[in-house]
Amino acid sequence: MAGSLFADASKRLEKALKYVAISDDAGERLKYPKTSLSVSIPVRMDDGSLKIFPGYRVRYDDTRGPGKGGVRYHPNVTMDEVQSLAFWMTFKCALLNLPFGGAKGGITLNPKELSRAELERLSRGYIEAIADFIGPDIDILAPDVYTNEMMMGWMMDQYSIIRRKISPAVVTGKPVTMGGSQGRNTATGTGAFYIMQGMLPKFDQYPENTTVAVQGFGNAGMVVAECLYQDGYKVVAISDSQGGIYNEQGIDIPAVIDYKQRHRTLAGMYCDQAICDLGENQQISNAELLALDVDVLIPAALENQITRDNADQVRARYIFEVANGPTTTAADDILASKGIYVFPDILVNAGGVTVSYFEWVQNRSGLYWSAKEVNDRLKEKMVEEAEHVWNITQELDVNVRTAAYIHALNRLSEAMDAKGTRDYYQDS
């Protein structure tokens, strides 16, 4: 637990352990990952030079089933980050009652600096390096930050080449033509929207009286913003890594999505070269967005966005974490003292892994579902588990994050106990 992010993540476990009758053995196991792999990936660049990229894969726990977790491409990827993300995946899968453990992977690079051919060589090289540690019954990959269905297709193809058989279930989030599931591309954002639909009315927050700010306008942030807009919520602010826009009257989300998809950034959306016509819109920074006086704040970017340093500036009444780990433990305490409800990442963004599970099931069975079937099953799953978590908050008088960890811990503890005491009887 040397890394700062992982040390912070583990504090959430410690808070929940006070409320769960878990054995000392089970508690001790959950403090450490099962396997942590570091690899070096050589890639021949388009100019003929050779570059080495560091890569990682962590399988945190497989008590409830094979590891499950995405692969991210980002300049800030470290073993500490990957281990923390695998830790969160363990609890996320248990919380949603999926037959998976938690895993995560990543490569340290800026993918925007590589050509498509270089990214393909990198993706295939990553699978070459970790092939003996993954598989449909061992550890299953998926998209994450700056990875997409195209890259998942390359990875599945490379694994199939290595194993000399078609193995679609080793990767989820693939193109539909390669065995991917309907609805997987939008699952994280759609699942978050279902959680909000179920939870906000408990506080008398409805579309007509609720303002929303979304930090992060990648796949998940874009989808949840559009879902909210279509349902009648007033989305007044959005941002990406380059900055954002604010409009007190509400933003035309479909128009922004169209621009973002054509230009890959929100920066300059209302500008022609150096001349900007913002109209009713104002340009704002990510820091300013987090401090807006809105009903709902949705962090949908990266981890550690709300910290001890800026939590006191947050004025939203409800936070729904679409990103992984956007709020630090110290910030949690400050937000709680202000009466702000934080709906945690392991619940809110679990739509992605839930539909990944659906894809894995479809790959294994050979039976494929329509988009309506996928979304109906997703909504049922998300709403059901959110209600379980909410009931725990009422019964034990704990915050929503602690309730989510309690719910997940109960399932993990049951699975560990069900496996028996084989460790006591192994030959020394």
UniProtKB/Swiss-Prot annotation:
Signal peptide: none annotated. GO terms for cellular component: cytoplasm; cytosol. GO terms for molecular function: glutamate dehydrogenase (NADP+) activity. Keywords: NADP, Oxidoreductase. Belongs to the Glu/Leu/Phe/Val dehydrogenases family. It comes from Synechocystis sp. (strain ATCC 27184 / PCC 6803 / Kazusa). It holds the Pfam family ELFV_dehydrog. This is NADP-specific glutamate dehydrogenase. It is an enzyme of class 1 (oxidoreductase). PANTHER family: GLUTAMATE DEHYDROGENASE, GLUTAMATE DEHYDROGENASE 1, MITOCHONDRIAL. InterPro entries: Aminoacid_DH-like_N_sf, Glu/Leu/Phe/Val/Trp_DH, Glu/Leu/Phe/Val/Trp_DH_C, Glu/Leu/Phe/Val/Trp_DH_dimer, Glu/Leu/Phe/Val_DH_AS, Glu_DH, NAD(P)-bd_dom_sf, NAD_bind_Glu_DH. NADP(+) binds at residues 188, 219. Substrate binds at residues 68, 92, 356.
